[in-house]
UniProtKB/Swiss-Prot annotation:
InterPro entries in UniProt: HAT, Nucleotide-bd_a/b_plait_sf, RBD_domain_sf, RRM_dom, SART3_RRM1, SART3_RRM2, Suf, TPR-like_helical_dom_sf
Coiled-coil segments on the chain, per record: 533-593
Stretch list, region Disordered: 1-58, 567-686, 905-938
One of the protein's GO biological processes: lymphocyte differentiation
HAT repeat placement: 88-120, 126-157, 163-199, 222-255, 304-336, 339-371, 374-410, 467-500
Protein name: Spliceosome associated factor 3, U4/U6 recycling protein
Pfam family, one: LSM_int_assoc
Native source species: Danio rerio
Subcellular location: Nucleus, Nucleoplasm; Nucleus, Cajal body; Nucleus speckle; Cytoplasm
Region feature (Necessary and sufficient for U6 snRNA binding): 517-941
Skewed-composition ranges (Basic residues): 582-596
RRM domain: residues covered: 688-766, 785-862
Disruption phenotype: The egy mutant embryos that lack detectable sart3 expression display microcephaly, microphthalmia and die by 7 to 8 dpf. Pharyngeal arch formation is defective resulting in a thymus devoid of lymphocytes and exocrine pancreas development is also impaired.
Ranges of compositional bias, category Acidic residues: 14-56, 608-619
Length: 951
């Protein structure tokens, strides 16, 4: 210690001179900045009333007002800080940064800007201490080599103060511990440390030609040993450009590099070569590089060096701070492997600051606090913060309450009849039930604890530890009144509690109530009651139990028989409807074949045969169900000419003007005109073909245009556009490839805009051969990694949404919902890399404004789509009738119904509504006749006659 003091006294004059020189340089820079500031302030005074300043001030006030409403708006904080820094409002800028740092961990860029601004205005030693405190806060958020390098460089500027050199060395050592193992950036800290010590060495060396004293020689030897030690330590760490460091040490060391150092260097070099592929993968990949970091982490865990595992985790989290799974993996590793209190608790605290919506991180934090002996108030404060974190599921609140109650239970000494900890535990149980009932149900419309898990545990604690069966029974009575009395497992749980800690009378009472109320597994409950009476009961108890169970089981059998009868009736009705549909379809097919036989000419016949084989009419219904797009209610005349039953039966053939290109043969029939590239039917393969639809009807040369569009997918055998008899393009076609491998590439062009409309591309499948084939490619269930945005301006584009959402995470896909004409509906789906990013986007974007439109953002959970047979019933019987009533061109024929008007009305005035409609009996049409299907039987002509006579 004395040597250290003498060293500082010897070095102080030289250090003070260097410090004074640095201060003079800083003062000159400050003078220049002040001069620039004066000129700038004069310009500001001259342009004080400029429009830009007024706009900026108005924007600042708007941002501050928005933050007063929602303090957790991250983007608003960033915009406010950027604007205040631009305007040079230092006092307000400092307050804005301080407020943001209290709510969020700050990024490396924000911290560096803040630190540089504070360093620039530092004037005296007290201000330097404030900057030191700011650095200490900055290094706690993330492990950033740049911030550590800025920290050590700033500390060098204060080494002239009392104890300054030791302070600099202390900060350097902490920096090496934090980032010295960083394979690509750690070398900068090592080199800065060595350069600092070499500068110190130059100050302790005696002037040339003088004989150093013993004290000077000791100082010189100690300083040389420090530099040797730094070289040896660095060469033992796998870092990039190790060869250069080794060569530098070889030149610097007078006696050469020791063998032990060379051995450590070679071993570190081998380790560096193992990790080099992972570093190169990180170098060439795009942020946030999560997959590459995951591979790197797995490699380091397999290698088994805890320090290197820690640094790679920290590097990954610096770029993926909003990935809860990565934080969970890191904290779990620290809990199970390192178990260092300060390191573990710091990681848990940073985890919940970055991902506060993740319940699992809060739960792990509470366990870590208890594991490392944190005081009760600290655990309680962390739990209260967790309740205000804003979880996305009701069950998350149940789990965090469960973890906290477990902690409180472990604090209680149940050997005492009364304790303050026991009262606190009971109060916490009561508060948890109240919290779930009020706060959670108000937000999620459910408590999240349908099985009353918390109450069950409370009852078991009262029975087991407190010997208070009366309280346990009260709790179970409350559990059963919350809709759990029909479940056998709930009654058996209560029975087991009474069996363990109660008496036989209450066991018998519980089982009798269970037999009376259970509806899911009554046989099991009855068996438990009979077995109980075999062991515990008298003859009278046995007779009562047998009578009760027989009565219950007989009633259950009757109920099941009625249900089975209803199901059988429903199955028969469905089978009859299916048979009727098959019959109607067969009649239509026969009628269609008859129409074909009566047609004159071979050309029309060939065209119809081609269309039937390619399955175009079978494809159209599936295309109608694509995407979230609604089908236009007004169907164009061209689409209504389809020959299948999609939009109605084809109208009877009428005389038509023959389109251009038709010429009759000697018998008067038109000659067929095959397309130039049309191929025989037997050569067509559906697996090599795609169906293209929703094209504009006035497309010129559709074959040539589509051939150009799809030529990049593979070699095209044929493009077959479909035309009406008049020669009008129907808006859909088939593209046949030579190789089936081209089909997936063609399907990727689905929804591509062509002539202002989204082009639909789907597999070519014959629905007659594959009736269950579904074209709808988007999920109709909840997708937690995808968000649904409504309320968008119709002018919003994919680029607009990408700019809006990219700051919340990695975007995988953006889909704007459009109608068939390609116009936006103001709805969009944005798919993120993971659930955490989507949840963060919902929290940050919901309720924000875009071009004066208020956005509504939620997790994607589209409603299930109804199939044809599941369509909601209409208000009137006519709406449920087959489409043959509308004819080939919609409602071209008369709409007069021959059904009596009294039967055409709704069945009952109080019929239940479903999705905005009222159920009514189904009407069916067979061969032009309408009949009414009721739940009892169909009405005959005699029934209609009797009904008319009653009037």
């Amino acid at each position: 210690m004395a040597a250290t003091g003498n060293e500082e006294q010897t070095l102080l004059p030289d250090i003070e001179e260097e410090a004074e020189g640095m201060e003079r340089e800083m003062e000159s820079e400050d003078d220049e900045e002040e001069g620039m500031g004066v000129e700038h302030s004069e310009e500001e005074d001259e342009e004080d009333t400029s429009e830009d300043e007024r706009e900026n001030e108005a924007e600042i006030q708007r941002l501050e007002e928005q933050l007063s409403i929602n303090a957790f708006d991250y983007n608003c904080h960033v915009d406010l800080i950027k604007l205040l820094r631009q305007e040079g409002k230092l006092h307000r800028l400092r307050k804005a940064r301080q407020k943001m740092s209290e709510l969020f961990p700050l990024t490396e860029e924000i911290w560096l800007d803040w630190l540089k601004d504070e360093i620039r205005i530092t004037e005296d030693e007290s201000d330097r201490e404030k900057v030191y405190e700011l650095f200490e806060r900055a290094i706690k958020d993330y492990v950033c080599p740049e911030i550590w390098l800025e920290y050590v460089q700033y500390s060098i500027g204060g080494m002239g103060a009392q104890g300054g050199i030791e302070r600099v060395r202390s900060i350097f050592e902490r920096a090496l511990t934090a980032v010295g193992l960083h394979m690509t950036k750690g070398a900068s800290i090592w080199e800065a440390y060595r350069e600092f010590e070499i500068v110190i060495l130059s100050t302790v060396q005696p002037p040339p030609g003088t004989v150093p004293s013993q004290e000077q020689q000791e100082l010189l030897s100690a300083q040389l040993e420090r530099i040797h030690t730094l070289f040896r330590r660095q060469l033992a760490v796998p870092l990039m450009d190790m060869e250069g460091t080794y060569a530098e040490y070889s030149d610097w060391a007078d006696d050469g590099v020791p063998e032990t150092v060379t051995h450590q260097y070679r071993r570190a070099l081998q380790q560096m070569e193992k990790g080099k592929p992972y570093e190169e993968a990180l170098l060439v990949s795009e942020p946030p590089k999560l997959a590459e970091y995951q591979s790197y982490i797995d490699f380091e865990i397999k290698e088994g060096d805890p320090a290197r595992v820690q640094i790679i985790f920290e590097r990954a989290l610096a770029e993926n701070c909003l990935v809860p799974d990565l934080w969970i993996k890191y904290t779990t590793y620290l809990d199970r492997q390192l178990k260092i209190k300060d390191l573990v608790l710091s990681a848990h605290e940073r985890a919940v600051r970055n991902c506060p919506w993740t319940m699992g991180l809060w739960k792990s934090y509470l366990l870590a606090l208890e594991r490392h002996g944190a005081d009760h108030q600290t655990v309680k404060d962390v739990f209260e913060k967790a309740l205000n974190a804003g979880f996305i599921q009701a069950t998350d609140y149940v789990e965090i309450w469960q973890s906290y109650l477990d902690y409180l239970r472990r604090r209680v000494d149940f050997s005492k009849e009364w304790s303050r900890e026991l009262d606190e535990l009971r109060a916490a149980f009561s508060r948890s039930l109240e919290y779930l009932k009020q706060d959670v149900e108000e937000r999620f419309s459910e408590s999240g604890d349908l099985s009353c898990t918390l109450m069950q545990i409370w009852a078991r604690i009262e029975a087991l530890h407190c010997k208070n069966m009366q309280k346990a029974r009260e709790l179970w009575d409350s559990i059963m009144t919350k809709g759990n009395a029909k479940y056998a497992n709930m009654w058996l749980e209560y029975y087991n509690l009474e069996r363990s800690y109660g008496d036989a009378a209450h066991c018998r009472k519980a089982l009798h109530r269970a037999v009376q109320c259970t509806s899911d597994y009554p046989e099991h409950v009855c068996d438990v009651l009979l077995n109980f009476e075999r062991v515990e009961g008298s003859l009278e108890d046995w007779d009562a139990a047998v009578q009760k169970t027989e009565t219950k089981l007989n009633r259950v059998c009757e109920q099941r028989a009625r249900v089975a009868e209803k199901e059988a009736l429903h199955a028969r009705q469905e089978e009859e409807k299916a048979e009727q549909r098959r019959k109607v379809k067969a009649d239509k097919k026969a009628q269609k074949k008859g129409q074909k036989a009566n047609r004159t000419g071979d050309k029309r016949k060939a065209e119809d045969d081609d269309e039937e084989e390619w399955g175009e009419e079978a494809e159209l219904p599936s295309k109608r169900l694509r995407g979230e797009d609604d089908f236009d209610s007004t169907v164009t005349e061209e689409l209504m000419e389809t020959e299948s039953g999609l939009f109605g039966r084809r109208a009877p053939p009428a005389r038509k003007t023959e389109p251009p290109g038709f010429r009759k043969n000697q018998q008067g029939a038109p000659e067929p005109q095959r397309q130039p590239h049309d191929m025989p039917k037997e050569q067509r393969k559906d697996e090599n073909c795609v169906f293209v639809s929703n094209l504009t009807f006035n497309m010129e040369d559709p074959e040539g245009k589509l051939r150009t569009l799809f030529q990049g997918c593979g070699t095209i055998q044929q493009v077959r556009p479909v035309f009406t008899a008049k020669g009008t393009f129907r808006g859909y076609c088939y593209v046949q490839f030579e190789d089936r491998l081209a089909v997936p590439e063609a399907l990727k062009m689905d929804r591509q805009e062509v002539d202002g409309r989204p082009m639909y591309v789907s597999p070519c499948v014959d629905k007659n051969k594959n009736p269950d084939f579904k074209v709808f490619k988007y999920k109709t269930s909840m997708e937690k990694h995808k968000i649904f945005i409504s309320g968008l301006p119709y002018s919003a584009t994919k680029e607009t949404l990408e700019d809006l959402c990219k700051e919340h995470g990695t975007i995988r896909a953006i889909r704007i919902v459009t109608n068939r004409s390609g116009k936006s509906k103001g709805l969009a789906y944005v798919e993120f890399e993971d659930e955490a990013q989507a949840s963060q986007a919902v929290l940050k974007m919901d309720g924000t404004m875009l071009e004066n439109f208020t956005l509504s953002v939620a997790i994607s959970n589209p409603p299930g789509r109804r199939m044809k047979d599941e369509a909601a019933p209409s208000r009137f019987l006519g709406a449920a009738m087959p489409r043959q009533l509308q004819g080939a061109r919609g409602k071209g024929r008369t709409q007069i119904s021959l059904l009596p008007r009294s039967l055409y009305r709704q069945s009952t005035p109080d019929a239940k509504a479903e999705n905005g409609t009222i159920s009514a009996p189904h009407a069916t049409v067979t061969d032009g006749e309408t009949s009414l299907d009721t739940q009892t039987k169909s009405l005959s002509n005699e029934d209609f006659a009797r009904m008319l006579l009653k009037k």
